[in-house]
């Protein structure tokens, strides 16, 4: 009896080892779970459900196979794949969740999210996020030809990489006050998120009680998952 959480796989054809590791994870660990939650940035980039990239179909089929054996799979959008829509959700069998969700896991109330909304010290990123999450901007982007969308996405990734190279690590991490405010708002003592690529279990105080923030790692040379059971919450790194 366990519920699994992963995030920040950044799947792309240029990283076949990570793709293969994820497919193995779906074939083994995921099938033994009560449920699988993917907390964003499953893909390195997403320019629309109509992108014919074969990798997308392969991943959709692999997730659907997990769903078909009775393991529900849920998805929260990340900052790289926020345009994943209903078509891909149908193909993969995933259930799309809002950007924040509270789960009752074996008696624990756990808040889950991608995590980028916690990085409120990075004003430039938050302004950019507000623009690209505007429904009108998204609709306009999705009407463009695929080759133009690819160019725009590549330019945005390059710009993001350049901008991040000049930012301090502290600015790109979560804001402690924002974390506490979110946990107090949702009345939880547990938070699980990704985005920062800094796997750790942080202890803090929320509502004058002990609380925990569990940060998933990105999938690079190893995989990262959070495993929640009736008795424990574990942050686990494993070879790909």
Swiss-Prot record:
Assigned GO CC terms: cytoplasm; extrinsic component of plasma membrane
UniProt keyword annotation of Protein transport present: no
Cofactor note: Binds 2 Mn(2+) ions per subunit in a binuclear metal center.
Pathway in which this enzyme or protein is active: Glycolipid biosynthesis; lipid IV(A) biosynthesis; lipid IV(A) from (3R)-3-hydroxytetradecanoyl-[acyl-carrier-protein] and UDP-N-acetyl-alpha-D-glucosamine: step 4/6
Catalytic activity: UDP-2-N,3-O-bis[(3R)-3-hydroxytetradecanoyl]-alpha-D-glucosamine + H2O = 2-N,3-O-bis[(3R)-3-hydroxytetradecanoyl]-alpha-D-glucosaminyl 1-phosphate + UMP + 2 H(+)
Keyword list, A-Z: Cell inner membrane, Cell membrane, Hydrolase, Lipid A biosynthesis, Lipid biosynthesis, Lipid metabolism, Manganese, Membrane, Metal-binding
Cofactor: Mn(2+)
Localization, UniProt: Cell inner membrane
The keyword Plastid appears for this protein: no
Pfam families: Metallophos
One GO process term, biological-process aspect: lipid A biosynthetic process
Domain of life: Bacteria
Membrane topology of the entry: Peripheral membrane protein
Residues that coordinate or bind Mn(2+) 2: 41, 79, 114, 195
Molecular function terms from GO: manganese ion binding; UDP-2,3-diacylglucosamine hydrolase activity
Family annotation (HAMAP family): LpxH
Sequence similarity: Belongs to the LpxH family.
Protein name in UniProt: UDP-2,3-diacylglucosamine hydrolase
Protein source organism: Salmonella agona (strain SL483)
Source lineage: Bacteria, Pseudomonadati, Pseudomonadota, Gammaproteobacteria, Enterobacterales
